[in-house]
Amino acid sequence: RSGHGRMNVTSAITNSCNYIFLFDQLQYQDIAPLNPGHIFYLPLATDVAFMQSAIAKDVFDSRLRADLSFVGSLYTEKCPYDKLQSPSDSLRGYLDGIMEAQLKVYGYYFIEDLLTDDIVADFKRCMPDYLALKDSPFLTDSAIISKYYIGNKISSLERVSLMKQLSKRFPMTIYTNSDTSCIPGIDNRGGVMTRTEMPLVFHYSTINLNMTSKGIRSGIPLRIWDILGCGGFVISNYQPEIPEYFSIGEDIEVYES
């Protein structure tokens, strides 16, 4: 990224020397025509043998045992949307409204469809160091705003809201370096080491919770594969590709509202 906040991703995508693999089917459908024969759809996976070997090395640690757990960021500390400066009441109200509506819908991300030219222009004026992608036919301003800015904000709002609701009713444990002071009652045990501690959390938690980032439109995030590879039980938000690979109610459970 240059000092002007511009990146030329189109040349990287269309370069005949590059091969790109995407785990999100909808993203693949958008990008594949830009470089036929060089862009592929490939779901993620996990190294089950490695995960099981990490679990086998377990030395009992009560910090890594939980009834209901979530591992990951709340996105509160890295949300570019929060840099929005002095938006008008109408812009703020419109953005708050569409984000609130999206929070209630799983399996379909409609924010980009609701960003008019006027809203896009107003947003750009209020966003310092706006991330513009040079000469990109598919990453338009509306796509950037909906995915990079608003998508991250919705993910943050969703995670904080769900953690608040769950911690009021159940012993909720979170493994994160995010600030959880706004969530009373939650048990924040800090971050975990990806290769040594995280497999134990997934294996020994009674219920593992997955909340997919809104930037992943249809694909299955790595977190789901890792939890299942550790022999853990997972409840996830609904993603369109989940039923293509798993039997809901047998391999995995999902929530939709």
Regions found by a protein language model. Give the residues of each.
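Catalytic binding pocket for nucleotide-activated donors in carbohydrate/polymer assembly enzymes
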Residues: 6-8, 12-14, 29-37, 41-42, ...
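Alpha-helical packing segments of well-folded alpha/beta enzyme cores
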Residues: 27, 158-162, 201
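Conserved hydrophobic/aromatic pocket- or pore-lining residues that grip, position, or stack substrates
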Residues: 68, 166, 227
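Residues that form generic nucleotide/phosphate-binding pockets
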Residues: 94, 165, 169, 245
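Alpha-helix-centered segments that form part of catalytic cores
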Residues: 122-169, 175
